[in-house]
Amino acid sequence: TFDTGGISIKPAPDMEKMKYDMCGAAAVIGAMQAIARLKPSVAVMGVIPTVENMPGGKAQRPGDIVKSLSGKTIEILNTDAEGRLILADAITYAKQLGATHLVDAATLTGAVVVALGHHFTGVFTNNDEFLARWNEAAKNSGEKMWHMPVNDQYREQLKTVYADIGNIGGRDGGACTAAAFLREFVEDTPWIHLDIAGTAWLDDSKPWMPKGPTAIPIASFVRLAQDWK
């Protein structure tokens, strides 16, 4: 759904493109539809958290403390970092449902676009073996991915006095601190995080893709499920 940034409102230029901020959810729906038809041997579930981030009298405010589904508290330092809040609860919920491996996809940060442009999806993980499986699926699907760090140093940037974790980590390494935030809720479950903010849609046509939504990373999702053993 639409993301204005809430009380921490986005600049007006290009805000109309925030209709694309649901591309991660759309990718999960598309992948689940294909997986249901192909019937691979592995059980796959899709969890899709949705929210509209709008300013208003009941809007979330900077300085609010919220309690996540996991029980951990989060200090809201910027209301435009709302996607990671709902992803955190979706991750916890998927674990409660019995997920043994997790892959999330989200147009999570502008920082990943600064780092990688529109050519590669940023990939973050806590498990090298799972990353190897994912990379093979992405390679066979023709979708370009780039491994990014999510070390403990990025978690340090999320420390806050009033809650277990803050929802932003400052200017530096924004894509990495966003991934570190999610890792807090993943814990030890093998996990892949895909920041598709730069690859989910294109403003201009490329030799390999027309402008508009790209459907990345649906093909990789489906290939991973098909090849799972």
Regions found by a protein language model. Give the residues of each.
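A generic structural signal for tightly packed, nonpolar segments enriched in small/aliphatic residues
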Residues: 1-229
